[in-house]
From Swiss-Prot:
Its EC number is 2.1.2.9. This is Methionyl-tRNA formyltransferase. It catalyses: L-methionyl-tRNA(fMet) + (6R)-10-formyltetrahydrofolate = N-formyl-L-methionyl-tRNA(fMet) + (6S)-5,6,7,8-tetrahydrofolate + H(+). HAMAP family: Formyl_trans (MF_00182).
């Protein structure tokens, strides 16, 4: 197999792990595209993306156009003479002229089993929906949003204790090896592109802080999924004692909840059981404002008066109540 001349486009840590795999492979990374440096930290100093930092460590030329829609940026990219462009969480739209520039086009690493969960938050939405599995899809990019032909897919069972953070780590391990395997198939001409079935497609909408507020009227099963899906961001939470309480770990209890949704049924070292629309959600690890995340047993030692059985927790905004 003749090594490929690769352009890589990506920005966050997830992308950097794929770039590292390419650097370690027999292929040649001839250039890296990453989003412009952004202000970060308390001093708001400009900070390079993880992808840019890794590229500079290996003396790989870095390009940071604000857009790839202008002709100068497109001409600069074309002049590099890449065989293929690998795109992983880049964050900029690639116009058709860019998709057509490399000899083998552009391929993307997407964090779901396409065509399910196209879009911005596939890992989180798989948890949110209660999917049994997720995975990585390597696809040939076209002008649509994650609509290109699929080249290779991996599968990863979703476990009960998985969160978005843990799935992110698992897929960040699966993705690079899948990418290297797909590049080998493309170089040898042994891959058969598989069109996506539009009837099976759905979209992973971006997450919002508002969506992460717990609504105790929902079934405990759904709230449990949300706690896992929104960990680490935006973190499931509910208002109580004029504070926003974050929930990092919870479980479902089948104990009958005769009380109104949001009522604390019990509070002990096993957790705080809260009545929901169906069953009870047991809060196991929570975080009070200005504090670290703590096991409920430790929280109760310090703030047991906040969580006495019979207490009614908020979790529905007035606007929600008006619509109910």
């Amino acid at each position: 197999m003749k090594p490929l001349k690769i352009l890589f486009a990506g920005t966050p840590d997830f992308a950097a792990r794929h770039l590292q795999a390419l650097i370690d492979s027999e292929h040649q990374v001839i250039g890296v595209y990453s989003q412009p440096d952004r202000p970060a930290g308390r001093g708001k100093k400009l900070q390079a993306s993880p992808v840019k930092a890794l590229a500079l460590e290996h003396d790989i030329p870095v390009y940071q156009p604000v857009s790839l829609r202008n002709e100068d940026a497109q001409a600069e990219l074309a002049a590099l003479g890449a065989d293929i462009m690998v795109v992983v969480a880049y964050g900029l739209i690639l116009p058709q002229v860019v998709l057509d520039t490399p000899r083998l086009g552009c391929i993307n690493v997407h964090g779901s089993i396409l065509p399910r969960w196209r879009g911005a938050a596939p890992i989180q939405r798989a948890l949110w929906a209660g999917d049994a599995a997720t995975g990585v899809t390597i696809m040939q990019m076209d002008i649509g949003l994650d609509t290109g032909d699929m080249l290779l897919k991996t599968h990863l069972p979703i476990e009960d204790r998985d969160t978005s953070a843990s799935l992110y780590e698992k897929l960040a391990e699966q993705g690079p090896s899948a990418l290297i395997q797909a590049l080998k198939g493309l170089a040898e001409g042994s891959l058969t592109p598989e069109p996506q079935d539009e009837a099976l497609a759905n979209y992973a909408e971006k997450l919002s802080k508002e969506e992460a507020q717990l609504d105790w009227r929902k079934p405990a099963e759904q709230l449990w999924r949300e706690v896992r899906a929104f960990n680490p961001w935006p973190a499931s939470h509910f208002p109580h004692q004029d504070a926003a309480i974050k929930v990092w770990q919870a479980s479902v209890s089948i104990e009958a909840a005769k009380q109104a949704p949001g009522t604390i049924i019990r509070a002990d070292k096993q957790g705080i059981a809260v009545a929901t629309g169906e069953g009870a959600l047991v809060l196991e690890t929570i975080q009070l404002p200005g504090k670290k995340a703590m096991a409920v047993a430790d929280v109760l030692n310090a703030r047991g008066d906040w969580f006495t059985p019979g207490t009614q927790l908020q979790g529905v905004t007035p606007a929600d109540e008006a619509q109910a």
